[in-house]
């Protein structure tokens, strides 16, 4: 059963939060079912907290509509992969309990979202840069490093200077946090060097 927004707001008020956003799969579900007014009403409710309000989505067309209609948001949480393919109109798996085991991400999704984000002046937090690890499937460690740097180039080369990229890590088998940070530093230094040339 979906969480009661009023109850959630009372709980959030006690936490000294620095921002809040409308969860992406819920945004997309409401959008796909022609219930955008509910999204807008929730955003207005979130605004009462007095902190920046964001909108999460997996769909570029949601951001385009939000921008066109002036929805009350300060930032976007934009998934680089459209997790709504083949699930359009369905509620979030967090609500239904439906597994995501067969969820497949498509490489053509990332450029579509990045193209949309180039037109947005508001700050963006891009996430699922590595397609939930699917871009590494069948790759050697060296190929994985190259794939990571290619994604950094594509994503960070497209985002605005103050936008963010959120990268998930799985620490059980190796220190992915350290590896990702080192690869980012390598990529960034190489990019700066190329810009100076």
Feature map (PLM): residue ranges:
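Active-site beta->alpha loop and helix N-cap motifs at the rims of alpha/beta catalytic domains
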Residues: 1-34
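Short, acidic/polar
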Residues: 2-12, 59-61, 147-155
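Surface-exposed cleft-lining segments at the edges of enzyme active sites
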Residues: 21-35, 47-52, 92-104
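Histidine/lysine/aspartate-rich catalytic loop segments that bind and position anionic ligands
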Residues: 71-96, 104
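Structured C-terminal cap/extension of enzyme domains
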Residues: 111-197
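Glycine-enriched alpha-helix->loop->beta-strand junction motifs that scaffold or abut catalytic
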Residues: 14-18, 47-49, 68-77, 119-123, ...
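Hydrophobic faces of well-ordered beta-strands that scaffold small-molecule active sites
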Residues: 20-22, 53-55, 76-78, 125-127, ...
């Amino acid at each position: 059963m979906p969480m009661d927004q009023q109850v959630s707001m009372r709980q959030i008020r006690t936490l000294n939060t620095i921002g809040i956003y409308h969860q992406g799969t819920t945004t997309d579900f409401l959008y796909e079912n022609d219930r955008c007014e509910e999204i807008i009403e929730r955003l207005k409710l979130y605004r009462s907290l007095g902190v920046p309000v964001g909108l999460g989505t997996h769909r570029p067309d949601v951001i385009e509509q939000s921008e066109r209609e002036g929805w009350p948001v300060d930032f976007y949480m934009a998934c680089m992969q459209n997790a709504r393919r083949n699930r359009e109109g369905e509620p979030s798996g967090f609500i239904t309990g439906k597994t995501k085991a067969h969820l497949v991400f498509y490489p053509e999704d990332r450029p579509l979202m990045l193209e949309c984000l180039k037109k947005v002046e508001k700050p963006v937090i891009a996430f699922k840069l590595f397609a939930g690890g699917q871009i590494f499937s069948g790759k050697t460690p060296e190929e994985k490093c190259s794939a990571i740097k290619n994604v950094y180039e594509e994503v960070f080369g497209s985002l605005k200077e103050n936008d963010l990229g959120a990268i998930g890590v799985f620490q059980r088998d190796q220190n992915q946090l350290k590896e990702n940070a080192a690869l980012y530093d390598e990529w960034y230094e190489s990019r700066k060097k190329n810009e100076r040339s």
